């Protein structure tokens, strides 16, 4: 995004950095919650846990959708701006990046399917407890941010506009020095 040097791609890159911090932070929290219960991060150790942890499964799916850039959630805004702003300058690289977005979506959905769907595949998962009040109160603000930014991207864009313009002008200045 930033390397394309265009205003739209730079603005998208800044927004994507913010969104990645929110979404990746939420995913790490969620993985940590599960690790505290089972003391493993091995995907094959799970299966069917949405039966015992339905709130956790719903929040993990929502966060996964935000991570892969589903429209209406925060991950879409920056990714779309980056791809649109970069395409004119770097058609092949932008196409490869768009393919990477598709691969990331496939992986996230594959992981979700293995961990959450189907019957419970490990007896240790039968006694897993769903999110407690502390965990719920710590993850919900991030979930609300993902939704808010996805629905009202202009709000976060209003904070980014000036910086994106400054970076665009700086890049243009350095192009003129050559």
What are these regions (language model features)?
Residues 53-55, 108-178:
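Cytoplasmic/organellar membrane-interface segments at the starts of transmembrane helices
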Residues 1-129:
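Functional transmembrane alpha-helices
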